[in-house]
Amino acid sequence: MNISYNWLKEYVNFDLTPDETAAALTSIGLETGGVEEVQTIKGGLEGLVIGEVLTCEEHPNSDHLHITTVNLGDGEPVQIVCGAPNVAAGQKVVVATLGTKLYDGDECFTIKKSKIRGVESTGMICAEDEIGIGTDHAGIIVLPAEAVPGTLAKDYYNIKSDYVLEVDITPNRADACSHYGVARDLYAYLIQNGKQATLQRPSVDGFKVENHDLDIEVVVENSEACPHYAGVTVKGVTVKESPEWLQNKLRLIGVRPINNVVDITNYIVHAFGQPLHCFDAGKIKGNEVIVKTLPEGTPFVTLDEVERKLSERDLMICNKEEAMCIAGVFGGLDSGSTEATTDVFIESAYFHPTWVRKTARRHGLNTDASFRFERGIDPNGVIYCLKLAALMVKELAGGTISSEIKDVCVAVPQDFMVELSYEKVNSLIGKVIPVETIKSIVTSLEMKIMNETVDGLTLAVPPYRVDVQRDCDVIEDILRIYGYNNVEIPTTLNSSLTTKGEHDKSNKLQNLVAEQLVGCGFNEILNNSLTRAAYYDGLENYSSNHLVMLLNPLSADLNCMRQTLLFGGLESIAHNANRKNADLKFFEFGNCYYFDADKKNPEKVLATYSEDYHLGLWVTGKKVANSWAHPDENSSVYELKAYVENILKRLGLDLHNLVVGNLTDDIFATALSVHTKGGKRLASFGVVTKKLLKAFDIDNEVYYADLNWKELMKAIRSVKISYKEISKFPAVKRDLALLLDKNVQFAEIEKIAYDTEKKLLKEVELFDVYEGKNIEAGKKSYAVSFLLQDETQTLNDKMIDKIMSKLVKNLEDKLNAKLR
């Protein structure tokens, strides 16, 4: 945000240089990126002088050029070739001398001696647009006869210079989005540093209603979105160019002057942070302003001549017949004041930040008004700024104040009450701050001391400080004004020590699994814990009712905490796929957050919130890069399943003691889940639905696995690793071809096998699945291998046949299996 050095001095008196002011602001948290000397006209008209055309003759080699001699007031006249049709002898003109830099937007060029059609030219006679004082290019500037040759153009045009401070306002500092807001903080800095300073703003005591010739009523139908709305009329105004001082003020901070009425509103928003709007009162049909919402899809044409479809959640400023303005965001095409306007209705309001922010995002608009409203303006400044605007309109545009202030306020803004402990101040800052210093700082920041004890203060924080509502916020303010550099680095460091525990074990295992995944070709990703609530619309397993929503999000794309890692990974896949990198394996460790309204407890606010640590895996695209050694093969859900099983094995879990079953989940087209026998879900994995992939513009199949790291850590607490000697006796393998119903899973066969022979059965492997020719409908064939081994003896055929017969019988009885 651009802050004018001279403008700042109108509100607080100080003797710091521009660079010292920038350093002071940076030290108190208003980081100032740079200081730039500026003029009301770019370049300050340096090198331009007033000249008198002595002679003007036609160019011998051109039908439109003229050869002139010009008196610049300091020596011999100069010869200048000029192409303007209106140049003539005897004129007083503006001349750019050799070496002068002229600007065209961000580009500039230097005036040099040159030959034009064979005739030497040592300068340039200028038009309005060439030096930045206007837009006319029809001919050169012709000055009044009393203009004196040799006068510097910057003196003739009374060019003003200033210094602009580029202040980077953080999102929480809505109160500093104006010159007066910055002046408040600078005032506190000056007081803390022993300077004599006063903070002042223009008086509005002169505001007086002169007649009631133009009463316009105000009706607020949606007080949630608009807690405070006020307006007043000024009758008999003349809309014209603003006086030079006002134009200069705006130009110096990069704002283009428009007319006196609009410039007044722009002046006030940059001076005090209160957005205003001046309606042409003659266009307010029915002499009534109504603040309300309109039906979904209502068309509305804004000032930029774009027709927008309104949402039923867009707050609108309307008259009796039609909408005039998107509240707090953008005016309508016919809502503003023009040269034909004679009466104005000035609006000043406090719109709810959330409503303004969502409307601005919906329509892709970012205006000076929405920038401030969505962060939270000073609710106590509504009437002050309205009165100031009315007085300025009366002064600069004429007219009379022709109505009482129509003030609709449903909620009087209250101060934030904060209990401040001296002990906590000193503890958080790391230094004992004198009590008198603390009191001086908080009062210089316009906080009122409501009560004082030996232990601390009760403070009333003004409502414009939306970022200061807790004691730690006040302490932060105390520290920044006291000065970070005034807190010495301690010579000793105190720290509490703890023995290694579960957290350290979890970290080691996390690193172990991460190394395993990297070895399998995965890349680790790290996504924002904040995500878009719209991703959860229509989901049952991850209902939007259970989202942890942000009260004051900066963006609709980051307005809630994630319930699942899935969507962050899909964003990463989409980002890579759009850059021709579609063969991907990702993993991410991160927290997921959950809100449960049923657990609401006034005494335990956090009882409704929970968070769990998860591991997410994403696989998509080709299994391996194409080469002569590897055929073109896509990744599959079975590949992902193998990765999940390997992780569980690496953590020491016995897969035979886990329960695998089908999972119905609206993020998966098909999926399985892995549970402990006690019913705790350890993992789920499957094929992501086409609907979700389409929302991210992903064409390839994506396979996703979610592992609950917290439950995994609980499960491995009971895992005991035992070592045994490698058997000296050979293992025996037997294969069976089983005909089963199509819906029977291999996991069921595996479970029955291990339940049948607990001692000698070591492995069960599926090596072929067949459906089709010679297999009846609704059936499939599993080819399964069984590995048997005894650590004490060599197995003979009789022992093996007995085990296999028992196994076949159990499969026939429980799964209706038949041998092929």
From Swiss-Prot:
InterPro entries: aa-tRNA-synth_II/BPL/LPL (IPR045864), B3/B4_tRNA-bd (IPR005146), DNA-bd_dom_put_sf (IPR009061), Fdx_antiC-bd (IPR005121), Fdx_antiC-bd_sf (IPR036690), NA-bd_OB-fold (IPR012340), Phe-tRNA-ligase_IIc_bsu (IPR045060), Phe-tRNA-ligase_IIc_bsu_bact (IPR004532)
Predominant subcellular localization, coarse grouping: cytoplasm
Top-level enzyme category: ligase
CDD domains: PheRS_beta_core, tRNA_bind_bactPheRS
Domain FDX-ACB: residue ranges: 727-820
Keyword hit for Phosphoprotein: no
GO biological process, alphabetically ordered: phenylalanyl-tRNA aminoacylation
Disulphide bond pairs: none
Cofactor(s) annotated in UniProt: Mg(2+)
GO cellular component, one term: phenylalanine-tRNA ligase complex
Localization of this protein: Cytoplasm
EC number: 6.1.1.20
Keyword terms: Aminoacyl-tRNA synthetase, ATP-binding, Cytoplasm, Ligase, Magnesium, Metal-binding, Nucleotide-binding, Protein biosynthesis, RNA-binding, tRNA-binding
Pfam families given in the database record: B3_4, B5, FDX-ACB, tRNA_bind, tRNA_synthFbeta
Residues holding Mg(2+): 467, 473, 476-477
Residues annotated as domain B5: 413-489
Alphabetized SUPFAM superfamilies for the sequence: Anticodon-binding domain of PheRS (SSF54991), Class II aaRS and biotin synthetases (SSF55681), Nucleic acid-binding proteins (SSF50249), PheT/TilS domain (SSF56037), Putative DNA-binding domain (SSF46955)
Residue intervals of the tRNA-binding domain: 42-154
A GO term, aspect molecular function: ATP binding
Chemical reaction(s) catalysed: tRNA(Phe) + L-phenylalanine + ATP = L-phenylalanyl-tRNA(Phe) + AMP + diphosphate + H(+)
Keyword check for tRNA-binding: yes
Cofactor note: Binds 2 magnesium ions per tetramer.
Subunit structure: Tetramer of two alpha and two beta subunits.
Homology family: Belongs to the phenylalanyl-tRNA synthetase beta subunit family. Type 1 subfamily.
Protein name, UniProt field: Phenylalanine--tRNA ligase beta subunit
Organism of provenance: Bacteroides thetaiotaomicron (strain ATCC 29148 / DSM 2079 / JCM 5827 / CCUG 10774 / NCTC 10582 / VPI-5482 / E50)
Organism lineage string: Bacteria, Pseudomonadati, Bacteroidota, Bacteroidia, Bacteroidales
